[in-house]
Amino acid sequence: FIAEPVQGAGGVIIPPETYWPEIQRICDKYEILLIADEVICGFGRTGNWFGSQTLNIRPDIMTIAKGLSSGYQPIGGSVVTDEVAAVLDSVEFNHGYTYSGHPVAAAVALENLRILEEEGVIDHVRDVAAPYLAEKWHALGDHPLVGDTRIVGMMGSLALTPDKTTRAKFASEPGTVGYICRERCFANNLVMRHVGDRMIISPPLVITPAEIDILIGRARQALDECYARVKEEGLLKAAS
């Protein structure tokens, strides 16, 4: 069974509290390997070193990348339990790589991990940035264009809707309003992507409360501008 602890590129989909415990129970019962894709969630993004810790998952294998070097060098890897490693060691396993164990990428990853530890970056996310961002992010839920706010650690999403009461989808082609909102974000010097009509954000782990205030201010301004344009173009209609 392979999954992200929190689905990132799909729209920051945070599972309900009962989801992962049930997945873990089923995998344990039927001896199914549980593989956690930590490419996005790993290395502090959710407020712990790994998203599996945040969601209380016990994976047999974790895939890692991006945060391993903070994006400064292309590097990825797999982390396995002792049980999985023992199986791999017991048989001959031949596999060819064009590149592997590159010394520059490995050195950058080690230095990145040292900095994360010595500067307390993960502690900062867990104790300072994430709680403050969550409070401010959920406050955007009062905007007439926002039907739902979700956030865990430094991963947040806003669901855009033409009707806050029903949280209905737009009648327009999916992503039409999301694209308009994205463009207004860019115009206000805020990098916020859209997945359909859901806006997603993943700010730097070292962001400060003062910088979060700037982020939220720009997000609200972008939402205001998007709302005005959506009304002007007659797009504020719910799907039937």
Language-model regions, residue ranges each:
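Conserved N-terminal phosphate-binding loop of PLP-dependent enzymes in the Aspartate aminotransferase
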Residues: 2-240
